């Protein structure tokens, strides 16, 4: 086998491979002889068909089959010989395939770039230092109360955050219009669910009162006939309801799994959950800064094949998410354009190559304790964490994913140890609200 390597452009390579004629011809002859023993052809006894007859009937197909196998086999032998690592599958082009002549073909493909991670010490990282205060805990408890609040009818004027039940009739130039009328319509105030100006006269009204709202439909309103039109709504308030927050007591504590209803135990559990979420957010915050700094200081050539693979993966993930949210078969969804995923795909490929180089140069090995910690963190969000942990540990694919995540985190820790890190005091809500 003769091999010549050509760099065509950037990461693109062309291997021209020549396989001796005798190698191909002998394989073709052997394959034809095997066929002669098994093929049934009229006029010949089984196993007694002359090779010349088999060659006439099957020779071209057999040669194509042998040539295809030879291209695959010799390509992989060639890249081992030349110490080349392809990024993606090759495209084969046959140059010469004639009986008695050498088989010559070209394999075009991309290679991985040479990656040298530099300027790690120039990565700037602000590491937030956060303490969960009693005030933070009180705010979280208030949030939990609001999540379990109920609507109760009140005998007072309505306020911005109330829920009102109304009848309304809309008119344009004194004439009612389609879709402008409703009875016992529940409206949660302050959510901007109605057109601008509709809620304004309702604020301050009591049940049984009638008010009038003068409005103008937006130019981008979904109903073509109403765009930009001035209208008047006569609104009758039937009921006003305010949010009733539950007391933080024994019953409230039981809602969150505290069986004995101990409020102090609830506070401790809520603080523990806040701490866990905070630690995850801080880790993600620091990791993002490290990655962004790494990318900013290390621009590398990317194999198109890897970017295309990542685009396809992102496209498939988007289709699956859409299907889960909206329902329906993903096969019926239109093909999403590659441009939607190009930037994110390039970023992900760059991160993978750079962190891969860190893992290689630092000779990092998977830290089993870190893998266990990652699994426990993932499982803690479920009702039965131990069951989830067991599921992970008996699923090879999930375990491989967690090992990859652990290695990536170890690489980030190496970068962080060399980066320019400055600790900055931050408030809990500042960090968590930024995440949201």
Swiss-Prot record:
Its EC number is 5.2.1.8. It is found in: Cytoplasm. Residues 161-246 form the PPIase FKBP-type domain. Keywords: Cell cycle, Cell division, Chaperone, Cytoplasm, Isomerase, Rotamase. It holds the Pfam family FKBP_C. One of its GO terms (cellular component) is cytoplasm. GO terms for biological process: 'de novo' cotranslational protein folding; cell division; chaperone-mediated protein folding; protein transport; protein unfolding. The keyword Cell cycle applies. Consists of 3 domains; the N-terminus binds the ribosome, the middle domain has PPIase activity, while the C-terminus has intrinsic chaperone activity on its own. NCBIfam families: tig. Belongs to the FKBP-type PPIase family. Tig subfamily. Involved in protein export. Acts as a chaperone by maintaining the newly synthesized protein in an open conformation. Functions as a peptidyl-prolyl cis-trans isomerase. This is Trigger factor. It comes from Pseudoalteromonas atlantica (strain T6c / ATCC BAA-1087). The gene is tig.
